[in-house]
């Protein structure tokens, strides 16, 4: 959705770039975006924010110096900082340690909760 694209742009500019410091991100490795399915692929569950076009899963990054980081292998200080910075820009942020379904990627979506952002 347009809201998700705007949130992604805001996160890149205000969260990802500052978190990476001097490392210039030239590519964000997207694992999933729009896909019509239920949450966590569970039969009979609620439709996922991916199915509404409001979610992006980030699997890693490529840098200008040719190095690459995956969330699964490089959930380091900079990536944790970028993950934390997404909270509030997105309605939901999930990643390693959140729930078992997001150990190898960062999940961001623009769901709107009355209680505020859900960040884990």
Residue ranges with predicted function:
Residues 20-53:
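Active-site-adjacent substructure of cysteine-protease-like catalytic cores
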Residues 17, 29, 47-120:
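Catalytic cores and adjacent binding grooves of peptidoglycan-active enzymes
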Residues 1-28:
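Active-site acidic/histidine clusters and adjacent loop/turn architecture
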Residues 14, 38-41, 74-76:
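Detector for Asparagine
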